[in-house]
Swiss-Prot record:
It comes from the Bacteria. The keyword Aminoacyl-tRNA synthetase does not apply. ATP binds at residues 49-56. One of its GO terms (cellular component) is plasma membrane. Gene3D superfamilies: P-loop containing nucleotide triphosphate hydrolases (3.40.50.300). Residues 15-264 form the ABC transporter domain. It comes from Sinorhizobium fredii (strain NBRC 101917 / NGR234). This is Probable peptide ABC transporter ATP-binding protein y4tR. It is a peripheral membrane protein. Keywords: Amino-acid transport, ATP-binding, Cell inner membrane, Cell membrane, Membrane, Nucleotide-binding, Plasmid, Transport. One of its GO terms (biological process) is peptide transport. GO terms for molecular function: ATP binding; ATP hydrolysis activity. The lineage of its organism: Bacteria, Pseudomonadati, Pseudomonadota, Alphaproteobacteria, Hyphomicrobiales. SMART domains: AAA (SM00382). Probably part of a binding-protein-dependent transport system y4tOPQRS for a peptide. Probably responsible for energy coupling to the transport system.
Length: 335
C-alpha cells in the first residue's frame, strides 16, 4: 500500500514497489521486497533499522550503484523529478549521480582516493558536472572546504586523506557531495566511525547546510536519537520492507509497529536507572533467501497471533501520514 501524499507538495523523489535481489551461486537473497516512500524538496527523511534491514541497499538501488555481477533491481520505479532513474542510460545516470543526487558514505577513508589530494578530488567532481576550468574548480573546492568549516582550508586543500582526521575527512566528503548543489543528499550512516563529539558536529553541519542550500536529505541511520533531533519524517525498515512510516513527532508519540516499539525500548534511558538491564530484541532477522510467509517480525514479536505467521501484513494508514504493516496495529498503538 502506498501512503497518500499531499498532491500540492513538492515531490522530489518517489520510490515505488522497489525490489532488489542479490545472487549467489545457489541462492537468491531478496534484499528489498516492494519498498514505497517519497522525499519532498527540502525535507530531511530518516530511514532507520537494524544492520541488514535494507537501508543501504535502498540507497544504492536508487543510484544504481549495486555490483552488477551479483545484484539487480528486479522491480519497481524510482521517479526523480518526473523521470524513472531505472530506465535511464548509464550516460544519463552519470549526469544525475553526484550532480542532482549525491551520497555520503559511512567510511570516508575508503571512499576517498588515497593517491590524490582532497582538493583535487572535490575539484574533479565539479569539473565532471560543470564546464569550468581546473583553476575555477579548485577555487570552488576551496569555497566548499570553507563552507564545511574545515580549519585552514588553503592548506587542507593540498592534504591527502591520510593526513586528515576522521572528522575532517567526513567534512571533505560532505564538501564533495554538495559541491554541485544537489537537490537530494543521501547520507548513509555518515557519523558511524566518529567519536560522539565529532558526530554531533557533523550532524549539525549537515542540518545547517540543508537549510542553507535547500537540499533534501535522506538520512540513513540505526540511531533513533539522531532521527528525533534532525528529521521531519521517518521510515522504519525490517527485513527488506518498510514496517512503519510517520512524522517524527507521531512516531515517537505513538509507535505502532512492535518492531518500532522494540527499537525504542532498546535505546538507553537514564530514567530506567543504572541497575536495570537494557532490553534487547530476542531472536534473529529471518533469512531473505526464502520467500517470507506471514509477517517477517512474527517470530520475534510478543504480540504475534496465528494470522501473523500465515499472511504478510500490508502497510496501512493508522491516521493521515502514519502507517504500519501490522495485523494488530490498532491494539498495539493503544498499549
Amino acid at each position: 500500500m502506498r501512503m497518500q501524499s499531499n498532491p500540492k507538495a513538492d515531490l522530489l523523489l518517489d520510490v515505488r514497489d522497489l525490489e532488489t535481489h542479490f545472487y549467489g551461486e545457489e541462492s537468491v537473497t531478496r534484499a528489498l521486497g516492494g519498498v514505497n516512500f517519497h522525499v519532498k524538496s527540502g525535507e530531511m527523511l530518516g530511514i532507520v533499522g537494524e544492520s541488514g534491514c535494507g537501508k543501504s541497499v535502498t540507497a544504492l538501488s536508487i543510484l544504481r550503484l549495486l555490483p552488477k555481477q551479483t545484484a539487480k533491481t528486479v522491480g519497481g520505479e524510482v521517479i526523480f523529478k518526473g523521470r524513472n532513474l531505472l530506465e535511464l542510460s548509464e550516460r544519463q545516470m552519470r549526469e544525475v549521480r553526484g550532480n542532482r543526487i549525491a551520497m555520503i558514505f559511512q567510511d570516508p577513508m575508503t571512499s576517498l582516493s588515497p593517491v590524490h589530494t582532497v582538493g583535487r578530488q572535490i575539484a574533479e567532481a565539479v569539473q565532471i558536472h560543470g564546464r569550468v576550468s581546473r583553476a575555477e574548480a579548485l577555487e570552488k573546492a576551496l569555497e566548499m572546504l570553507r563552507l564545511v568549516r574545515i580549519a585552514d582550508p588553503e592548506r587542507r586543500l593540498n592534504n591527502y586523506p591520510h593526513e586528515m582526521s576522521g572528522g575532517m575527512r567526513q567534512r571533505a566528503m560532505i564538501a564533495m557531495a554538495l559541491a554541485c548543489s544537489p537537490e537530494l543528499l543521501i547520507a548513509d550512516e555518515p557519523t558511524t566511525a566518529l567519536d560522539v563529539t565529532i558526530q554531533a558536529q557533523i550532524l549539525r553541519l549537515i542540518v545547517d547546510l540543508k537549510d542553507r542550500m535547500g537540499t533534501a536529505v535522506m538520512f540513513i541511520t540505526h540511531d533513533l536519537g539522531v532521527v528525533a533531533e534532525t528529521c521531519q519524517r521517518v521510515i522504519v525498515m525490517y527485513a527488506g520492507r518498510i514496517v512503519e512510516q510517520a512524522s517524527v513527532t507521531d512516531l515517537f508519540a505513538r509507535p505502532t509497529h512492535p518492531y518500532t516499539r522494540a527499537l525504542m525500548n532498546s535505546v538507553p534511558d537514564r530514567r530506567r536507572g543504572r541497575q536495570s538491564r537494557l532490553p534487547e530484541i530476542p531472536g534473529v532477522v529471518p533469512s531473505l533467501r526464502e520467500p517470507l510467509v506471514g509477517c517477517s517480525f512474527a517470530e520475534r514479536c510478543p504480540f504475534a497471533i496465528g494470522v501473523c505467521r500465515e499472511k504478510m501484513p500490508v502497510l496501512s494508514e493508522i491516521q493521515p501520514g502514519h502507517a504500519a504493516a501490522c495485523w494488530r496495529s490498532n491494539e498495539v498503538v493503544n498499549l
